[in-house]
């Protein structure tokens, strides 16, 4: 009889524990909150070329601290803007955006990428390494190009279109080279993801055809030219997916496409938009195929328009992407850089509206903002909105590629509001979190470093209330979470 009662109590206890946990769609607890940091043309970092090592580091720490104050938990850092590198590479020269001349290393030498990753992870934030797959020379009239740049070594791989030079996406050797670059990054650095933006085939220049006819004639594979171009992009994405996950299975692969996949007037699967150029028809990036085939782990469509826009309405597009994520992680790209550009973007409610809208949809897991410098002057008071309302509590990043199950933490009271915490096993641990439930709403009350052994709730800013419930969880390196343990 005692055994039966004990079993019943254990079952009831497990049921209550299960009910206590928020769903994975609870945006107050689980949410990606990222910022793009562009290095091309020194948009965000470093502020200008030729800064001292100390100034480069100081600027980066300042922007990280600003984003952390705003509640961000990830950065998307551009490390390969134009066939170059913001890190030491045997494959590509140092970027001109660092020291002012392509091929010129910092002096005295240091590795900016290793530094940036360390500082980012120190703050509990993810580091997504953003690379441009096809742009090779940003401006053929002005850009510094080193003798060791790949355009000098293999000029036959490149075409000029407008004032830029591009890797020719139709040449298999280009795919192979890009895979070598990515494998080098993934194998040498503790990044959390490889990230690519919307620049596949370039946006069309009116009256000019992209000059890839020779490559098409040489290797058309029986396809018409438009399908051949899409096939080229499909091939490199499929290969990169394999390269990344074979090198380090836990590293994510994400794409941030232009906001319109295809207009409904061209395809019944498309959005009710009037995009002048689209991913599928102009950039030859079939994002839906990549999601459907599982070739990418997350997608961040750039929805840089306001709600109510007459050609590309934010509401229409955010709903469309919510319905076309194919089970992959979906975050929304916000055009915070547009603050003040028209009446809609002078409205302080625009970004709050966009956040509320995406949080109301089940398949959207967060936001990414373009770009870092836009936050410097608190546009429309949006820094305040994030700090005081939308991101007032920290959030746990979504678990995209978990490689192991996280062990349940152990917690014991040592006196007052002081506790000893830890885990019994040796699984890689990223952090602990205190989850609270207040008036039916879950939130993350505090994130705690993985090496913490003793915590004090008052010191963490967690003021316990009798009407609330509190739990401790352990978070793994890939953001997987343990069972919830009630805090006594």
Could you describe each region identified by the protein language model?
Residues 30, 38, 42-58, 129, ...:
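Active-site-adjacent "subsite" loops/lids of carbohydrate-active enzymes
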Residues 38-39, 252-275, 303, 317-351:
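Active-site clefts of carbohydrate-active enzymes
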Residues 58-84, 188-191:
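Catalytic domains of carbohydrate-active enzymes, especially glycoside hydrolases
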Residues 70-107:
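Aromatic-lined carbohydrate-binding/catalytic grooves of carbohydrate-active enzymes
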Residues 284-310, 326-401:
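Substrate-binding cleft of secreted/luminal carbohydrate-active enzymes
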Residues 477-488:
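Extracellular fibronectin type III
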């Amino acid at each position: 009889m005692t055994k039966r009662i004990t079993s019943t109590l254990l079952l009831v206890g497990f049921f209550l524990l299960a009910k206590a946990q928020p769903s994975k769609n609870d945006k107050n607890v689980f949410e990606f909150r990222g910022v793009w940091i562009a290095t091309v043309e020194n948009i965000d970092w470093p502020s200008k070329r030729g800064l001292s090592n100390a100034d480069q580091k100081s600027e980066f720490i300042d922007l990280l601290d600003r984003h952390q104050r705003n509640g961000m938990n990830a950065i998307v850092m551009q490390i390969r803007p134009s066939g170059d590198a913001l890190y030491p590479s045997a494959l590509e020269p140092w970027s001109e955006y660092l020291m002012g001349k392509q091929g010129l290393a910092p002096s005295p030498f240091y590795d900016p990428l290793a530094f940036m990753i360390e500082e980012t992870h120190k703050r509990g934030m993810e580091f997504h390494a953003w690379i441009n797959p096809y742009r090779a020379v940003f401006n053929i009239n002005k850009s510094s190009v080193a003798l060791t740049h790949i355009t000098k070594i293999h000029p036959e791989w490149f075409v000029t279109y407008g004032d830029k030079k591009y890797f020719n996406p139709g040449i298999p050797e280009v795919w192979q080279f890009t895979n070598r670059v990515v494998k080098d990054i993934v194998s040498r650095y503790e990044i959390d993801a490889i990230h690519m933006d919307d620049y596949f085939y370039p946006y069309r220049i009116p009256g000019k055809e992209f000059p890839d006819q020779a490559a098409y004639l040489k290797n058309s594979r029986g396809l018409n030219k438009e399908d051949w171009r899409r096939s080229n992009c499909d091939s490199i994405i499929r290969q990169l997916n394999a390269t990344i996950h074979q090198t380090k299975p836990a590293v994510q692969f994400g794409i941030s496409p232009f906001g319109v996949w295809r207009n409904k007037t061209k395809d019944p699967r498309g959005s009710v938009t009037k995009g002048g150029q689209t991913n599928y028809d102009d950039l030859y990036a079939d994002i839906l195929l990549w999601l459907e085939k599982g070739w990418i782990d997350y997608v961040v469509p750039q929805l840089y328009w306001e709600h109510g826009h007459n050609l590309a309405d934010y509401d229409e597009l955010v709903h469309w992407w919510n319905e076309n994520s194919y089970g992959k992680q979906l975050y929304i790209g916000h055009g915070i850089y547009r603050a003040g550009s028209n009446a809609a973007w002078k409205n302080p409610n625009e970004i709050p509206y966009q956040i509320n809208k995406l949080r109301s949809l089940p398949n959207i897991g967060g936001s990414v903002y373009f770009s870092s410098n836009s936050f410097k002057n608190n546009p429309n008071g949006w820094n305040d909105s994030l700090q005081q309302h939308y991101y007032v509590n920290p959030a746990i990043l979504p678990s995209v590629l978990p490689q192991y199950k996280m062990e349940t933490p152990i917690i014991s009271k040592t006196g007052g509001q002081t506790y000893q915490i830890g885990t019994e096993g040796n699984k890689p641990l990223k952090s602990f979190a205190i989850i609270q439930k207040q008036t039916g709403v879950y939130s993350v009350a505090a994130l705690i470093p993985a090496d913490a052994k003793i915590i004090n709730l008052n010191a963490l800013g967690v003021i316990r209330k009798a009407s609330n419930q509190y739990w401790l969880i352990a978070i793994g390196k890939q953001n997987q979470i343990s069972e919830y343990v009630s805090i006594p």
